[in-house]
């Protein structure tokens, strides 16, 4: 039976923190564009976050396996609230790049460690349901944030969005500080024992397939988050509120279907779910190229969200199973989160180059190509192991 107290604390703390981030991040491309940033610099703003997070993810993930989850979670959330103040004080594009780099360090302490904590308390056979339910905090926070950010920006100012981010991150920090049990009471697997070697984790074909799929799927998200606001603002002349709605839709729809798809992942072939979801999301990326109205983008964003909502619970269920078997939940989850970070970096920066060299709409084609590659590689790695349940010795 899952520990409902810990689960609820992590759920609401992450929801508050991610909502705060969601308020600010979709407006950063427009904010940077107003400072004179081109496509490459917009890509760097998102890429800087991914670089710092990717470097430190394995370190914090493995260390949390040995030292406990709570210290990393509360420090990371406190740093998020400090970063919001820095955003409010920034005056040029370089400031934004540096701040996002520091924010990536804080994120490396939060996301993989929180998900590993949930994995620690997940009962066997309930991986899909548990991770699907928990992922709702992430996806719904990211979806509500952009809408709130657009409304706050239109009604007040961009500086007000930074204040909201800081307050919500502080709320997440206080919830975890007060309600999570002390580190000594955590069910951390490794207590003075040597952790499983990285080469053993990386050599597992299922983990490799999960990593590459997560990388390519998130590259598509990087393109959307970085350049859909620019497309909607520059070419379609939409308001900040409507831009926020468009960015929100994909993650909102994905969040809604997380729980039913998670339950389904506990009952059927998880490989099939990942492949079907990936193909739907890739098709949506191609359709973004032909955007001509708010209504069209509305429908395509929903389609992308459905694809992610089908794939991600099954993907995370496989990852949690692997983490439990290896007694290295933090290490396995941090590796997948690294794929997420690298995908966001490659997607946003690659799309920025495509925008500067060719055309803004070509950026979405790049995302589609990467996603099709990810689906194919995932199928190759798991073709003989459709519902993996073992870890190499």
Task: State where each predicted segment sits.
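Intracellular juxtamembrane helix-capping segments at the cytosolic ends
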Residues: 109-122, 310-324
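Paired small-residue
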Residues: 83, 94-102, 295-303
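Helix-breaking motifs and short loop linkers at transmembrane-helix boundaries and internal kinks
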Residues: 36, 68, 89-95, 237, ...
């Amino acid at each position: 039976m899952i520990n409902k107290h810990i689960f609820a604390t992590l759920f609401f703390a992450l929801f508050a923190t991610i909502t705060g981030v969601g308020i600010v991040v979709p407006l950063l491309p427009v904010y940077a564009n107003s400072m004179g940033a081109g496509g490459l610099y917009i890509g760097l703003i998102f890429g800087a976050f991914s670089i710092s997070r990717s470097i430190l993810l394995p370190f914090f993930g493995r260390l949390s396996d040995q030292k406990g989850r709570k210290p990393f979670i509360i420090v990371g959330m406190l740093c998020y609230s400090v970063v919001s103040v820095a955003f409010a004080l920034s005056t040029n594009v370089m400031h934004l790049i540096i701040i996002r780099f520091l924010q990536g360090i804080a994120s490396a302490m939060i996301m993989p460690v929180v998900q590993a904590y949930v994995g620690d308390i997940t009962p066997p056979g309930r991986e899909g349901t548990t991770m699907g339910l928990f992922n709702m905090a992430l996806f719904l926070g990211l979806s509500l944030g952009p809408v709130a950010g657009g409304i706050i920006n239109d009604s007040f100012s961009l500086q007000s969005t930074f204040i909201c981010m800081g307050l919500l991150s502080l709320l997440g920090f206080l919830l975890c500080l007060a309600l999570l049990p002390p580190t000594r009471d955590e069910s951390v697997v490794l207590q003075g024992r040597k952790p499983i070697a990285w080469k053993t984790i990386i050599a597992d074909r299922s983990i490799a397939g999960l990593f590459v799929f997560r990388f390519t799927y998130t590259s598509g998200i990087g393109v959307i988050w970085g350049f859909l606001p620019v497309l909607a603002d520059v070419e379609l002349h939409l308001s900040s509120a409507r831009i926020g709605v468009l960015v929100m839709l994909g993650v909102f729809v994905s969040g809604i279907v997380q729980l039913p798809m998670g339950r389904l992942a506990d009952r059927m072939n998880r490989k099939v779910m990942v492949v079907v979801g990936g193909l739907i999301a890739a098709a949506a990326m191609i359709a973004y190229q032909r955007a001509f109205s708010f209504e069209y983008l509305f429908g395509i964003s929903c389609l992308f969200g459905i694809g992610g909502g089908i794939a991600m619970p099954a993907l995370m269920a496989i990852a949690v199973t692997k983490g439990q078997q290896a007694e290295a939940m933090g290490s396995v989850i941090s590796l997948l989160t690294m794929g997420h970070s690298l995908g966001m970096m490659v997607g946003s920066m690659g799309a920025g180059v495509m925008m500067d060299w060719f055309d803004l709409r070509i950026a979405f084609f790049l995302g589609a190509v990467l996603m099709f590659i990810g689906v194919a590689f995932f199928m190759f790695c798991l073709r003989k192991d459709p519902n993996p349940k073992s870890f190499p010795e």
